[in-house]
Regions:
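Terminal peptide-recognition signature
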Residues: 15, 19, 34, 52, ...
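Charged catalytic carboxylate motif
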Residues: 29, 33, 80, 87, ...
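Glycine- (often His-adjacent) and acidic-residue-rich active-site loop
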Residues: 32, 54-87, 103, 133, ...
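Crotonase-fold acyl-CoA enzyme core
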Residues: 89-202, 229-234, 239-242, 248, ...
Length: 255
């Protein structure tokens, strides 16, 4: 059976990590499958949103330590995994993590890379790499501090301690918490709601939101206005306004 299960739910694509014997550890093969699936979804106009999920006990417990144990310095410098993470990060449509159980190390970094995290009440997030004599290497230090702030990010990275779903929500890492048995259901429901909107507007909004973490406020405002102006020339913008005035549901075409 594949390490990545792929299911369609209307305009929502669900990618389910499927290495239960390895606690969904993210090895190169699984990262490659995720990157390839997202690249296909990016060019498929019938896909509006992607959801990445795990199993009831583990979203993903980290990188595959069996692979890492074989890496010396030259092999680490030539590792393909940074390129795989870059490919995953390049996905331009909304990406939601549906997290039950443990999201640790690379698993936490995968969740951080998503636009939204929907968590089960049994979820735990952590970056325990420091306990192995290493540090996060797939965006953990950079994305976590932008999500939860310096104090909590520093505590998690330097101590290796994890936080539960409620702490993650209070810190701004998690958007929603649900009973673990219903996490995927609610994540897919949220994804379906988002997928109803204009694909062009969703991509532009995601681009602007992500840019806000990298540039000054003034530069971000300028980019936001440029994207807003470009959307004003689209058929979807006219359809959205017409539908609102006519009190009907819009039918967006991505044009």
């Amino acid at each position: 059976m594949s390490d990545l299960l792929i299911h369609r739910h209307g305009r929502v694509l669900q990618l389910t990590l499927n290495r239960p014997q390895a606690r969904n550890a993210l090895n190169k093969a699984l990262l490659t499958q995720i990157a390839e699936a997202l690249e296909v979804a990016a060019t498929d106009d019938s896909v509006g949103v992607c959801v990445i999920s795990g199993n009831p006990r583990f979203f993903a417990a980290g990188a595959d330590l069996n692979e890492m144990a074989e890496k010396d310095l030259p092999a680490t410098l030539d590792d393909i995994r940074p390129r795989l993470w870059t490919r995953i990060d390049a996905f331009t449509k909304p990406l939601i993590a549906s997290v039950n159980g443990y999201a640790l190390g690379a698993g936490c970094e995968l969740a951080l890379l998503c636009d939204l995290i929907v968590a089960g009440d049994n979820a735990r997030f952590g970056l325990p790499e420091i306990t192995l004599g290493i540090m996060p290497g797939a965006g953990g230090t950079q994305r976590l501090i932008r999500s939860v702030g310096k104090a909590l990010a520093s505590r998690m990275v330097l101590s290796g301690e994890s936080i539960d779903a409620r702490q993650a929500q209070q810190a701004g890492l998690v958007s929603d918490i649900h009973p673990a048995a219903l996490t995927d259901e609610y994540a897919l429901k949220l994804a379906a709601t988002i997928a109803r909107h204009s694909p062009l507007a969703l991509r532009a909004a995601k681009q602007s939101l992500r840019l806000s973490q990298e540039v000054s406020l003034q530069a971000g405002l300028q980019q936001e206005r440029q994207l807003f102006s470009l959307l004003s020339a689209t058929e979807d913008r006219r359809e959205g306004i017409d539908a609102f005035l006519q009190k009907r549901t819009p039918e967006f075409k991505g044009r």
